[in-house]
Amino acid sequence: MSNHILAILSTPENELSGVVRDFKSFTSKAIVKAIHDENESRREWMLQRLVANATRAARNESYKVWTHDNHPLQMQPHFIMQRVNYIHQNPVRAGWVDEPRDYLCSSARDYQDEPGLLKVERVW
């Protein structure tokens, strides 16, 4: 999705916050670099937004890509399939694609034995 990420992650006990922190740090730098380096028509607008976000934050950052909060849910095995289906249907509900596997950034392709963009460990 263009303004949020839904993911199912598994980490060793008590390490999820560190994984999310490192993910946000790495991707923030990569996103800002891509905005600067690529021929992006909305470059100035996006950088202004990221600078404004950083100005409102208490941390000493030039740009702020991610919000400070997260919304983790601990999932039981019977709930995981429901959440995976919810995640896959998100771009369909938004009207971006007709089928979940048509959304390029979705793991839905992996669940239909088609190659996706990233390596995905299927949960069933």
Task: Identify the residue ranges that each predicted region occupies.
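Short catalytic/metal-binding and nucleic-acid-binding patches
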Residues: M1-W124
